[in-house]
Amino acid sequence: MNLNLRPKSECKYDAVSLGEVMLRLDPGEGRIRTARSFRAWEGGGEYNVVRGLRKCFKLDTAVITAFADNEVGMLMEDFICQGGVDTSLIKWMKTDGIGRICRNGLNFTERGFGIRGAVGCSDRANTAISKATPEDFDFDYIFGELG
Protein backbone atom coordinates (compact mmCIF):
# COMPACT_ATOMS: atom_id res chain seq x y z
CA MET A 1 0.00 0.00 0.00
CA ASN A 2 1.31 3.41 -0.95
CA LEU A 3 0.69 6.14 1.62
CA ASN A 4 0.35 9.51 -0.02
CA LEU A 5 0.00 12.54 2.18
CA ARG A 6 -3.07 14.49 1.21
CA PRO A 7 -4.30 17.95 2.14
CA LYS A 8 -6.21 18.13 5.42
CA SER A 9 -9.37 19.11 3.54
CA GLU A 10 -9.40 15.64 1.90
CA CYS A 11 -9.03 13.71 5.17
CA LYS A 12 -11.69 12.70 7.67
CA TYR A 13 -9.30 12.76 10.64
CA ASP A 14 -6.54 15.05 11.82
CA ALA A 15 -4.93 12.19 13.75
CA VAL A 16 -5.48 8.46 14.25
CA SER A 17 -3.80 6.26 16.86
CA LEU A 18 -3.20 2.51 16.79
CA GLY A 19 -2.67 0.71 20.08
CA GLU A 20 -4.15 -0.81 23.19
CA VAL A 21 -6.69 1.12 25.23
CA MET A 22 -7.01 -0.27 28.75
CA LEU A 23 -9.47 0.19 31.56
CA ARG A 24 -7.52 2.23 34.11
CA LEU A 25 -8.48 1.69 37.73
CA ASP A 26 -7.42 4.43 40.16
CA PRO A 27 -7.62 3.83 43.94
CA GLY A 28 -7.59 7.58 44.64
CA GLU A 29 -5.20 8.44 47.44
CA GLY A 30 -4.93 4.83 48.58
CA ARG A 31 -2.86 1.84 47.57
CA ILE A 32 -3.83 -0.73 44.97
CA ARG A 33 -3.28 -3.63 47.37
CA THR A 34 -5.63 -2.23 50.04
CA ALA A 35 -8.24 -0.43 47.94
CA ARG A 36 -11.93 -1.28 48.28
CA SER A 37 -13.05 0.98 45.44
CA PHE A 38 -11.55 2.40 42.28
CA ARG A 39 -12.38 5.16 39.86
CA ALA A 40 -12.45 3.93 36.27
CA TRP A 41 -10.85 5.69 33.29
CA GLU A 42 -9.65 4.75 29.84
CA GLY A 43 -6.03 5.04 28.89
CA GLY A 44 -3.19 3.94 26.67
CA GLY A 45 -0.12 5.73 25.35
CA GLU A 46 -1.22 6.12 21.75
CA TYR A 47 -4.87 6.75 22.61
CA ASN A 48 -3.98 9.43 25.18
CA VAL A 49 -2.39 11.45 22.37
CA VAL A 50 -5.51 11.55 20.18
CA ARG A 51 -7.75 12.21 23.19
CA GLY A 52 -5.54 15.15 24.12
CA LEU A 53 -5.58 16.50 20.57
CA ARG A 54 -9.38 16.28 20.57
CA LYS A 55 -9.87 17.89 23.99
CA CYS A 56 -7.20 20.60 23.74
CA PHE A 57 -7.37 21.56 20.07
CA LYS A 58 -10.78 20.23 18.90
CA LEU A 59 -9.07 18.11 16.24
CA ASP A 60 -10.97 15.25 14.61
CA THR A 61 -9.40 12.04 15.91
CA ALA A 62 -9.99 8.30 15.94
CA VAL A 63 -8.51 5.24 17.61
CA ILE A 64 -7.72 1.92 15.95
CA THR A 65 -7.85 -0.79 18.60
CA ALA A 66 -9.62 -4.02 19.47
CA PHE A 67 -11.85 -4.87 22.40
CA ALA A 68 -13.39 -8.08 23.66
CA ASP A 69 -17.09 -7.85 22.83
CA ASN A 70 -18.39 -7.68 26.39
CA GLU A 71 -19.58 -5.18 29.00
CA VAL A 72 -16.05 -4.00 29.85
CA GLY A 73 -15.30 -3.36 26.18
CA MET A 74 -18.54 -1.39 25.85
CA LEU A 75 -17.62 0.63 28.96
CA MET A 76 -14.26 1.52 27.43
CA GLU A 77 -15.93 2.45 24.14
CA ASP A 78 -18.23 4.77 26.09
CA PHE A 79 -15.26 6.40 27.85
CA ILE A 80 -13.61 6.96 24.46
CA CYS A 81 -16.82 8.53 23.11
CA GLN A 82 -16.92 10.84 26.15
CA GLY A 83 -13.39 11.92 25.21
CA GLY A 84 -14.67 12.92 21.77
CA VAL A 85 -12.60 10.34 19.89
CA ASP A 86 -14.24 8.44 17.01
CA THR A 87 -14.78 4.76 17.87
CA SER A 88 -15.86 3.51 14.44
CA LEU A 89 -12.47 1.88 13.78
CA ILE A 90 -12.62 -0.38 16.85
CA LYS A 91 -12.54 -4.10 16.07
CA TRP A 92 -14.87 -6.13 18.30
CA MET A 93 -13.42 -9.57 19.05
CA LYS A 94 -15.45 -12.60 20.01
CA THR A 95 -14.90 -13.67 23.61
CA ASP A 96 -15.67 -16.81 25.57
CA GLY A 97 -16.55 -14.89 28.74
CA ILE A 98 -13.57 -16.14 30.74
CA GLY A 99 -10.63 -14.63 28.85
CA ARG A 100 -9.20 -17.68 27.07
CA ILE A 101 -9.97 -16.30 23.60
CA CYS A 102 -9.37 -12.65 24.44
CA ARG A 103 -10.06 -10.06 27.09
CA ASN A 104 -9.72 -6.33 27.72
CA GLY A 105 -6.58 -4.92 29.30
CA LEU A 106 -6.54 -3.49 32.82
CA ASN A 107 -4.20 -0.91 34.29
CA PHE A 108 -4.07 -0.08 37.99
CA THR A 109 -2.36 3.21 38.80
CA GLU A 110 -1.64 4.73 42.23
CA ARG A 111 -1.10 8.46 42.33
CA GLY A 112 2.18 9.76 43.61
CA PHE A 113 2.17 12.02 46.68
CA GLY A 114 5.11 13.94 48.11
CA ILE A 115 8.15 11.70 47.86
CA ARG A 116 6.06 8.62 47.00
CA GLY A 117 6.12 8.10 43.26
CA ALA A 118 3.22 6.85 41.19
CA VAL A 119 2.92 3.06 41.01
CA GLY A 120 1.37 1.15 38.16
CA CYS A 121 0.43 -2.45 37.51
CA SER A 122 -0.93 -3.64 34.17
CA ASP A 123 -2.83 -6.83 33.40
CA ARG A 124 -2.48 -7.12 29.62
CA ALA A 125 -2.16 -10.82 28.88
CA ASN A 126 -4.32 -12.21 26.08
CA THR A 127 -5.95 -8.87 25.27
CA ALA A 128 -8.06 -8.34 22.18
CA ILE A 129 -5.55 -6.01 20.51
CA SER A 130 -2.71 -8.49 21.12
CA LYS A 131 -4.76 -11.11 19.25
CA ALA A 132 -5.62 -8.78 16.36
CA THR A 133 -3.87 -9.16 13.03
CA PRO A 134 -3.37 -6.62 10.23
CA GLU A 135 -6.23 -8.33 8.40
CA ASP A 136 -8.62 -7.29 11.19
CA PHE A 137 -8.34 -3.67 10.05
CA ASP A 138 -8.96 -2.26 6.58
CA PHE A 139 -5.87 -0.06 6.33
CA ASP A 140 -6.46 0.62 2.63
CA TYR A 141 -9.80 2.18 3.58
CA ILE A 142 -8.49 3.95 6.69
CA PHE A 143 -5.45 5.52 5.04
CA GLY A 144 -6.80 5.54 1.49
CA GLU A 145 -10.40 6.73 1.57
CA LEU A 146 -10.44 8.32 5.02
CA GLY A 147 -7.01 9.88 4.62
What does each model-found stretch correspond to?
Residues 41, 48-60, 82:
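Alpha-helix C-terminal capping segments
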